[in-house]
């Protein structure tokens, strides 16, 4: 399901048998209709970014709900897929902040310790937030609580009102929070553009004696 260390830590914040409930939910959801991402990618964020290597969290709300977009990493799409509006704005801010990045797959961020997590890990095709409030929030809240317990600093990048509510789980003074409006077209001009989250994250990591992220990779 997830990287084994993630699995053990997350379980400690969940009711007994919650993983069984998740598997039952997934069985029913994927049997009853088209759901994104592909089932094998539901836990991809936790599989490609081990807990011990995580130093940044970028929290999304739920996966893209269009064909072939969602790949299990928040905001990321496969390279051959056109960038959705929020990702276009993320890359625009990155270009203004650090430099241009012309590819849409953010897997190279994940491999450097950037956990690209959505609060909901699945979505019905064409129905934004269609699985919100059903199963995922206790699980992904537990992921944030696990990160909060880390001894090494983590930079939490929280875009938009939904993500910013998760600050309640970030109580360890070792960690850092970067927050702004969401990169969606509705709110990007209300403070997302110009917020410089990428250079600010690297400045924090380097001040903490950690290696910065190569955001252009």
Swiss-Prot record:
Localization: Cytoplasm
Pfam family, one: UDG
Active site per UniProt: 62 (proton acceptor)
Positions of disulphide bridges: none
GO biological process: base-excision repair, AP site formation via deaminated base removal
GO molecular function, one term: uracil DNA N-glycosylase activity
Catalytic reactions of this protein: Hydrolyzes single-stranded DNA or mismatched double-stranded DNA and polynucleotides, releasing free uracil
Xref: InterPro entries: UDG_fam1, Ura-DNA_Glyclase_AS, Uracil-DNA_glycosylase-like, Uracil-DNA_glycosylase-like_sf
Keyword line: Cytoplasm, DNA damage, DNA repair, Hydrolase
Catalytic activity, EC: 3.2.2.27
GO CC term, one of those recorded: cytoplasm
PANTHER family to which the protein is assigned, alphabetical: URACIL-DNA GLYCOSYLASE
Family of this protein: Belongs to the uracil-DNA glycosylase (UDG) superfamily. UNG family.
Main function: Excises uracil residues from the DNA which can arise as a result of misincorporation of dUMP residues by DNA polymerase or due to deamination of cytosine.
Classification via NCBIfam families: PRK05254.1-1, PRK05254.1-2, PRK05254.1-5, ung
Designated name of the protein: Uracil-DNA glycosylase
Organism whose genome encodes this protein: Streptococcus pyogenes serotype M28 (strain MGAS6180)
High-level lineage: Bacteria, Bacillati, Bacillota, Bacilli, Lactobacillales
Gene: ung
